[in-house]
Regions:
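Single conserved hydrophobic/aromatic residue that forms the stacking wall/gate
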Residues: 112, 118-121
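Short alpha-helical segments enriched in small residues
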Residues: 1-113
Length: 121
């Protein structure tokens, strides 16, 4: 689904969205907010690039990062769960991954995206 189509659906269905980003560095929030009338649905965009930002801003338990890594399903899930506590949006999205050029033990572009919602968009 394109960002333009999602934009139209969010407005039509009067849904709100917030995002917590890491590897994308705010690009997801930018893609939503560059469209006219995005204020009707876009509530919050947090860029938590460092582990410290994930811990301090999104309250990700440091043991999750230590055990599973910042680029893991567990970390991404904690990011979105804690985002939902502060944003109150109907839809919350988190993304974490390896942006490159080097990825350490994980491949460049290895990414986790979490979008829990009770209703289809």
């Amino acid at each position: 689904m394109s960002i333009q189509l999602l934009h139209k659906k969010l407005i039509k269905r009067k849904l709100t969205i917030s995002v917590a980003e890491s590897c994308t560095g705010g690009l997801l929030a930018h893609n939503f907010t560059k469209l006219a009338n995005s204020s009707k649905y876009f509530q919050m965009g947090l860029t938590t690039y460092s582990n410290q930002a994930k811990i301090k801003i999104l309250k990700v338990n440091k043991n999750i990062i230590k055990k599973f890594g910042a680029v893991s399903h567990e970390c991404c899930k904690a990011m979105v769960q804690n985002l939902s506590k502060i944003s109150k949006s109907k839809i919350n999205v988190s993304i974490t991954g390896i942006a490159g050029p080097g990825g350490g033990s994980k491949a460049v572009s290895y990414t986790h995206l979490t979008l829990p919602t009770k209703q289809p968009v």
